[in-house]
Amino acid sequence: YPGFDAAFVQQMKTLCAGADYLLPNITEACFLTDTEFKTEYDRAYIDELIAKLTALGAKTVVLTGVSYQQGKTGVVVYENGTYQYYEHEQIAGGVHGTGDIYASCFVGAKMRGKTAYEAAVIAADFVLECIKESQKDPTHTYGARFEPALCKLMQML
């Protein structure tokens, strides 16, 4: 994972202790919790990851890239002892920048008064729209095309 050496991970763990919201994907969560990364997993594995993340000090965990069934992907939101899961279609092929877009959208939705779960859903749906927009243009080779989807984001908010 580029940019994630042991020193970086240790510093991130320190930051997690004061975090109100932690939004890692599964790979990042494994680094932060010293957990073996698995390509196939069940709910118990995800629950264990989230428990380890909250043990670092984060109050609310939004774990992205969680897939309990083929063709679907989603997020698990853990807040105040409650788990909520949201999923949508999984689109083949990766697009750079979706994690940054997700985090930015999540924060924007929270600033607009949405709950953590509502913000997680809005961010997931917006990222999905960005990926779809990116795939419409075969000449676009780097980064998610978020600009064409901004109108949809404003409707979601």
Identify the meaning behind each predicted range:
Residues 2-83:
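Conserved phosphate/ATP/ADP-binding segment of small-molecule kinases
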Residues 28, 65-68, 90-92, 123-128:
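Glycine-rich beta-alpha junction loops
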Residues 83-96:
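Short pre-catalytic strand/loop immediately N-terminal to key active-site residues, enriched for Gly-Thr
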Residues 93-116:
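Short, small-residue alpha-helix embedded
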